[in-house]
Amino acid sequence: MGPLRESKKEHRVQHHDKEISRSRIPRLILRPHMPQQQHKVSPASESPFSEEESREFNPSSSGRSARTVSSNSFCSDDTGCPSSQSVSPVKTPSDAGNSPIGFCPGSDEGFTRKKCTIGMVGEGSIQSSRYKKESKSGLVKPGSEADFSSSSSTGSISAPEVHMSTAGSKRSSSSRNRGPHGRSNGASSHKPGSSPSSPREKDLLSMLCRNQLSPVNIHPSYAPSSPSSSNSGSYKGSDCSPIMRRSGRYMSCGENHGVRPPNPEQYLTPLQQKEVTVRHLKTKLKESERRLHERESEIVELKSQLARMREDWIEEECHRVEAQLALKEARKEIKQLKQVIETMRSSLADKDKGIQKYFVDINIQNKKLESLLQSMEMAHSGSLRDELCLDFPCDSPEKSLTLNPPLDTMADGLSLEEQVTGEGADRELLVGDSIANSTDLFDEIVTATTTESGDLELVHSTPGANVLELLPIVMGQEEGSVVVERAVQTDVVPYSPAISELIQSVLQKLQDPCPSSLASPDESEPDSMESFPESLSALVVDLTPRNPNSAILLSPVETPYANVDAEVHANRLMRELDFAACVEERLDGVIPLARGGVVRQYWSSSFLVDLLAVAAPVVPTVLWAFSTQRGGTDPVYNIGALLRGCCVVALHSLRRTAFRIKT
């Protein structure tokens, strides 16, 4: 039974070394030193082994210390990273092999082996079972601390992870411990191998195995620790060990299959891991804050750009609306200007029509003036012929007063006038616009002619003496005064046979009272009385109009002769022409009126009337000056008022000059 006991001892030593190697966790609960505990718990009397065998379990012995593997070697076997121990500040003490913390292997194979060899357990197994019993209470504390440490973000080393150590360390520890066990087995081969174990040790060993193999301790301890340790990769890979392992060992529990090697951070303490995580989180927070600031700055910039774009858009909209309003106003103004242009065109067209009518009227008047000039030339030639006819001697004064030559002349003039009016009518037919104006003008002339004919009827109703007073007659040669004629020249008058018959009848009635009136004034001058009919006929011939379109009608006039004092109220509807002639003596002693000088007379027969006519227009000017020019620097008179004042002062001399003879 020597070899069998040796193999069992080797197995126990290997199991103990495996427990010692698996007891390396970052959070270690240190127990009292191993030699003291051995002396207290296991006395030498109870140990069935020899001192040499018991020295094998003492790590302080020279042989054991020489043959045991250091903690660094376990660390290098467990992780495959020999430099990891220098990183971690928590280190196992040099007597780590004496640590009472031990774990039962989580395999059914080890449990069956323990069952088979339970009757042959020596003192070393009793000590290991006691150590296991004491480590039973220590299993909870590392588990709780591992659970607390596993709450960190980076993941720490938990108790189940240390419990699930690699098989390479077991193989190496068992292979390295074979030497002393071989020597001790050889020394202790004489010991009785069939020493019975106490029932107390059997109960303790069975309880410890049950507790460690129960699913409450093993499997749930792996379950919660695996997600926390998965971050740091605390599971050790099976390929990191330099020693070949038996694959059948891990078939039942499924440890470390395809797990990545751990990160170096898992060898830090939890405080350092927390510091690292805090540092990482701070850097991430700084980066996120920096990104947040960048995004906020971008948002602010985009908001400002959006505000600028809004302002620009609003400004553009305002400009567009203003442009539209300006366009509407411009269109309205264009329409108004078009309307104004249309109205101006229409008004100018009307004015052009009026101006054309004015030009037509001017052309008609020019043609009429030309016809008047031609008729005047013809009448002048006819009057010369009539003067030659008046030179024959007359038998009686009644016969001398015959008006046949002047009537013949007038008839000739009327015939010429009819021709001219016919030509004028033909011209008026050519111009249709001037018909209305011509008819209005003719109506005015006819009214004026009817008034003049009324004056002639008044002349006819007066007695013969008054009629003779109306005629300009030379009563004596001693006064040396000049007879003044006054006649009214009308405008273009279309004569009719009734008017000519009226004039002939008036002149025939004037022939009867002539002899009686001639004899009464002065009987001492028969020559002048005899020559009076000739002078009267000459006067009548002189009153024949040169223009066939005009008629010269007699009107009363004041004469400077002393015996003729009658005041005449003439009809002043038409323009007056004053004719003055110089005295010419003929061969027969008759003094007719010549046609030399023409004097215009603007004064009436009364001095007061002329004074009022000159001075009355000055009164409104003076009143206006006194009412508006008070305290002003402008003069209170104008040139018109000044001239009228001068005329008032020299009115007497001005009235006399009209009756002077101008040769």
From Swiss-Prot:
Keyword Nuclease among UniProt keywords: no
Query: Which portions of the chain have biased composition (kind: Low complexity)?
Result: 57-73, 145-158, 188-198, 221-241
InterPro entries for this protein: Syntaphilin/Syntabulin
GO biological process terms, semicolon-separated: anterograde neuronal dense core vesicle transport; axonal transport of mitochondrion; positive regulation of insulin secretion involved in cellular response to glucose stimulus; regulation of synaptic activity; synapse maturation
What is the name of this protein?
Syntabulin
Q: How does it assemble?
A: Interacts with STX1A and KIF5B.
The ranges of region (Sufficient for interaction with KIF5B) come to 2-417
The gene for this chain is SYBU
Query: Compositionally biased, Polar residues: which spans?
Result: 81-97
Name the keywords, alphabetized: Coiled coil, Cytoplasm, Cytoplasmic vesicle, Cytoskeleton, Golgi apparatus, Membrane, Phosphoprotein, Transmembrane, Transmembrane helix
Q: Which domain of life is it from?
A: Eukaryota
